[in-house]
Each structure stands twice: as C-alpha cells, then as structure tokens.
Regions:
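Conserved AdoMet/S-adenosylmethionine-binding subsite of the radical SAM
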Residues: 1-104, 109
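C-terminal accessory region of radical SAM enzymes
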Residues: 67, 132-149
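A structural motif corresponding to the C-terminal lobe/cap of the Radical SAM core domain
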Residues: 83, 90-93, 99, 115-139
Length: 149
C-alpha cells in the first residue's frame, strides 16, 4: 500500500512535472491531502502561499479517481469559522474520490522549533481549538458522499 501525504502546493499541469506526476500516480494507492484553508486570501495569510494549486490538485485526483483523505487543520482565529468550513464542505462535495475527512486540531508542539531557528512564530498566542469547535468542524465537514463508502 503506497500513500503520499501532501498539501499539493507544487502541483502544475506544466511539463516536465505533470508527466512525472502521472507516472508516480501509477504506483500510488491513495493520498492524504492537506487543505489548510478554502479561501485563497486567508490561505495566503495562514501559509504565505495561494491554495489554487492545492484545489486544482484535488480536482485532478478526483478526475483520475485516485482515493484521498482530506485533512484540515483547525486553527482558531484563522480557519475555524463556520463560513469557511461550509465552503470547504461544498468543495469536498464536488470531488468523487474522498474516502475520509479528518479535522486535525491545531497545536503548539512545533512552536519551539521556530524559536530555536530565531524566527517569530506566526501563530503565537493562538490556543488550540476547544473540543466543541472540533466537533462543530467535524459536523460541518461530514459529507454524504464519503460516509456512504
């Protein structure tokens, strides 16, 4: 069983990347795809990068029927708003290959790494989400499509 864990940010249909990706997909059973934010502008604020390639990669994987698990890190004050979660749900519903959706509660375990490298931690002061907010996100992101599989 071969699994790739990725956010897909490097995805492009340009060559030589795309033909190499197609070859790799022949040997890949499934992917775990991180979607950190459904809104492009908010994704840029959270990660410093656009989500356009990530969402296009998800569509490509759906087109080729490659099974995926969607993973969403729930970050208070960033991605933990019902509006964004509902938009993510609606996007997931457009995909035909989703086997599972996981809500990953944000944590601060890696904050020390930033400090050791002399960088400011961009999420300093943000606490992990409450149990209630995680349950809320799970409720919103449940989709009838993947629950039937």
């Amino acid at each position: 069983h071969t699994n790739i864990d990725t956010c897909g940010a490097v995805f492009t249909r340009e060559e030589p990347f795309f033909s190499k990706l197609e070859e790799l997909m022949k040997y890949t059973d499934m992917l775990m795809l991180d979607i950190k934010h459904i809104d492009d502008e908010q994704h840029k604020i959270l990660t410093g990068h656009s989500n356009k390639n990530i969402l296009e990669f998800a569509r490509y994987l759906s087109d080729i029927k490659k099974p995926i698990w969607i993973r969403h890190v729930l970050v208070p004050e960033r991605s933990d708003y019902d509006e964004y979660l509902e938009r993510l749900h609606d996007f997931i519903e457009t995909l035909d290959n989703v086997e599972k959706v996981e809500v990953l509660p944000y944590h601060t375990l890696g904050e020390y790494k930033w400090k050791e490298l002399g960088y400011d931690y961009p999420l300093a002061g943000i606490d992990p989400p409450t149990k209630e907010r995680v349950e809320n996100a799970n409720r919103i992101l449940e989709t009838a499509k993947y629950l039937k599989k």
